[in-house]
Amino acid sequence: MIYVTFTPYGAFGVKDNKEVSGLEDIEYKKLFNEEEIPDIMFKLKTQPNKIADELKEEWGDEIKLETLSTEPFNIGEFLRNNLFKVGKELGYFNNYDEFRKKMHYWSTELTKKVIKSYAQQKDKIIIQVAEAISDLDKTLNLLSERLREWYSLYFPELDHLVNKHEVYANLITKLGKRKNFTKSQLKKILPSKLAGKIAEAAKNSMGGELEDYDLDVIVKFAEEINHLYEKRKELYNYLEKLMNEEAPNITKLAGVSLGARLIGLAGGLEKLAKMPASTIQVLGAEKALFAHLRMGVEPPKHGIIYNHPLIQGSPHWQRGKIARALACKLAIAARADYVGDYIADELLEKLNKRVEEIRRKYPKPPKKKKKEKPKAKKKEKKGKKEKSKKKKDKKKDKKGKKERKVIGKTKSRK
């Protein structure tokens, strides 16, 4: 077996990890072209096994790479201690200043490539898009509330009749004035029954009259809110496409929004794939988990996976068990997505079977256990001798206080 250590300018190997005292003791060498060194270093960082296979074919023997998880090789220790000396002998450096400059350049180029590859990862884009949608939702809620309060000065009854912010903004954009809220116009946008109620409310509205230019400002504000709703739909469609490409198993089990939020909370698909099911189950419930660890309160049964329909639509005593089953399947789905396998249909079938089993097994809530009150500690009865001693001590203290003399200023003799 060949024990191999990499340096920025080449790969070096010896058989059976033998001692190395000089360049002549190194049996296998593969020197790199200076222009290709940053690319080779990046490849070594991201695909070390591929490079090991290439060396195996070239050198014709089994390869063992020195990594952070292995014990240091003898050849590795020699090269690290003599990096400049060996490089100079091989013709890479003429002096120490040149060595420092080249090492700095190679390290900088490697860092740039790592950052570039990190930014190109699709799961990082998924996280940003999901966060953008979340920010838009908060903004839309805030602006819609402002629109409702503002337009209620003119048509207050509409606020109670239309619950959805998007529909409310759409009505103001298309109709504007109260006189335009006729049944025929409203039926183009809303169901007939609701259209009739709004038309009747518009006729008998208690709202005040506004000037045309005041009303135009409100209508333009509503138009901007509508544009934001359209942008949100575009982002959601884009997120759905990304999730189906990068995490089809998670998307099938958890849905687009919940799956993207899980990837975001984990910090990426790779990190989510490395998480155990117990951690995935409580993602998003960190505060409750820390409260359990610090103060001993009940641990959380679920985090953001509570938003899954299987958990939300179940009775409270079944939710913890269903959350555990869902988290187990999501952990498998994340690993399958990371390696590029599609097993979502099989996972979904097993999950549904497990949920049905839980619902059959626990149809009724468990009986509540009565909490036993902690017994108060009985005060130990003090003996008569101890009581008499305390009384004597108190009497002595009182006598001592009376006997004490107060020392003040003495009067001067005349």
Curated annotation (Swiss-Prot):
Region (Disordered): 358-414
Any one of the GO CC terms: box C/D methylation guide snoRNP complex
Annotated InterPro entries: Helix_hairpin_bin_sf, MJ0694-like_N, Nop56/Nop58, Nop5_N_sf, Nop_C, Nop_dom, Nop_dom_sf, NOSIC
Location of the Nop domain: 246-360
Ranges of biased composition (kind: Basic residues): 361-414
SMART domains with a match to the protein in the record: NOSIC (SM00931)
Gene Ontology molecular function: snoRNA binding
Similarity comment text for this entry: Belongs to the NOP5/NOP56 family.
Full protein name: Uncharacterized NOP5 family protein MJ0694
Organism of this sequence: Methanocaldococcus jannaschii (strain ATCC 43067 / DSM 2661 / JAL-1 / JCM 10045 / NBRC 100440)
